[in-house]
Amino acid sequence: DYVYSSTCPCSLELAEHARATRGQLATPHSQRSVARLSVVLTDEMALEDLIELARDAIVTETQVMVKREDEQAFAELNAANPIFVEDAARLFCEALRADPRIGDFRVIASHQESLHSHDAISLLTEGPTFAADSLDPRLFQGLIHAG
């Protein structure tokens, strides 16, 4: 699993509109997000290479510990890269597809919503390996907030 943060593009646009038209301070909502990447390798690949591939696709990987100024820089990075869950899944797919060491793959992206009472999930597969079990509910364990 690759854990990243995502800012809702709609929420960001509405916050900017409120600030521009009414001078109202509004904060776009962002949330912790998880991409579960499953791959079939056609050649050797270190786990670190797969992690780097995910980091290159979505640059807002969550941080374990940050200083206050680093937290602000991360908030700015997050706001500069708003993304819907479907678009995040597509970016991961593009990165996986571009690596010749990767054959079939499955991407499950989950944006664990901070505003809505539901999570947003996108699932994409490439090749026959993962197609048959792509809707098995066990795939989503740990990706869905149960609360």
Q: At which residue positions do the language-model features occur?
A:
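N-terminal intrinsically disordered, cationic/polar leader segments
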Residues: 1-147
